[in-house]
Amino acid sequence: QRKGIHAEVENGEFLGLYRTKYILDEKPLISIIIPNKDHIDDLDRCVQSILKKSAYPNYEFVIVENNSTEDETFAYYEKLQKECEKVHVCRYEGPFNYSKINNFGVSHAAGEYLLLLNNDTEMINEDCLEEMLGYCSRSDVGAVGARLYYEDNTIQHAGVVIGFGGIAGHCFVQQKRGTTGYCLRIICAQDYSAVTAACMMVKRSVFEEVGGLTEELAVAFNDIDFCMKVRQKGYLIVYNPYAELYHYESKSRGLEDTPEKLERFHNEIRIFETRWPEIMKNGDPYYNPNLSIVRGDCAFRM
């Protein structure tokens, strides 16, 4: 009340830990942008998990078709659009470029809020959209990420630290579900320098203000770069552990396992380092410099 924030504060799982639940006075439209190439089993699991589980009613799907080759894929699109008026399919014709595909999807979206979502994800909790929207609706917040799990119920994403692996990486990877992490960071809502766009909500106004995703970064680091641009404009990047999904990771795109893909990857490293030299030199402001950037579990530097 003192801060004029419409929210309730609950006791968390442990003494001294609190959970803020934002009360949504309105139900703005959320456009869920999902790039897709074939793999309709993954896409259907993603879409159906939201349709069946989400308690939040006002959303649309913008599925961005990119270079599918299987007839079953297009038959599925047609069937899904007939069965569900929330679904819209648009076609991006060009080689895979994650940034261009999502920017294209946003141009076909009607929502005040955007949820960039990979097709190989699956919503777990019914209040996932409300949880992300609650933080994203704050005037000082630009983007919100979620807690993501691998299929074996270990952590895939709980925030991103600049410097991990030489450039940037996810925190607490492969720690067991239910683990709290260093200083309870896995289970605390908090600010980070970046979150993954495998599931990232952003205000449309902020997305447009920063010019969307940087299209020079076709595959790697485009989400980290986007978060850097958002922070540069003075907005916060929030990790919300109470929005939970599975992420089966890069099933449709495949691995970085060819000379061409490796060359592109190293070029994108150079682009990112050139664009953000200060944070690469000084380190992540949301990470203790006494902790390891070799390991992702916040162990002490040795």
Describe the function of each predicted region.
Residues 114:
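Short aromatic/hydrophobic "clamp" motif used to bind/position activated sugar donors
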Residues 1-30, 152, 164-191, 237, ...:
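C-terminal, non-catalytic tails of nucleotide-sugar-dependent glycosyltransferases
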Residues 28-33, 60, 225:
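Cell-envelope/extracellular polymer assembly enzymes that use nucleotide-activated donors
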Residues 30-42, 46-49, 53-54, 64-66, ...:
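A conserved hydrophobic helix/loop-capping motif in glycosyltransferases and polysaccharide synthases
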Residues 51-91:
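Acidic donor-binding segment of Leloir-type glycosyltransferases
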Residues 1, 128-132, 186-211, 216-246:
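A short, conserved alpha-helix in the catalytic core of glycosyltransferases
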Residues 92-109:
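Glycine-rich, basic loop-to-helix element that forms the pyrophosphate-binding segment
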Residues 121-167:
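Conserved donor NDP-sugar-binding/catalytic core segment of glycosyltransferases
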